[in-house]
Amino acid sequence: MCKARLVAGLLTLVLVTASWMSVSSALAASAADINRDATAALAKLYEKVPEARTLGGKAKGILIFPSIVKAGFVFGAQYGEGVLRQQGKNVGYYNTVAASYGLQAGVQSFGYVLFFMTDSAVAYLAKSDAFEIGLGPSIVVLDQGKAKTLTTTTGQSDIYAFIFDQKGLMAGLGLQGSKISRMEK
């Protein structure tokens, strides 16, 4: 019985991984598409959370992932593409990938923006082959309510993250363990 469960689990993992690889290549967007979607996503975030605009004005870099797709049934994966902006200019393109295992089911899309508040945090991203959220510079995930309490004295973290525009149904959403890698566009 245990062997049957193990084989079924491994088969599921192989199928999910194979499907995810074909989906992620189909999801690959052009630089123009990423730029357009990132501009719209950032404008939407600034409209809903005015405090994010204040952070954006002080940030050394803003990494915008306008749309990330997460899907899973026991095994899960997520993928999205984004752009790093410094002083309003696009300076690099990145993808974010995560895999998970556990009690989960569903499909969801969402976006997130990382505000890099220090030069050292931006440098860490630039020199990393795969920047993993949760390792390296400190990251604070903010929602609309928590953003209202942010001041110049409390805002001392390396990176602030906002998750927004969640659509679909999936239990469990987080950034921990996401790997961010530079890509050519």
Q: What kind of feature is each model-predicted range?
A:
Residues L27-K185:
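Small-residue-enriched, tightly packed secondary-structure blocks
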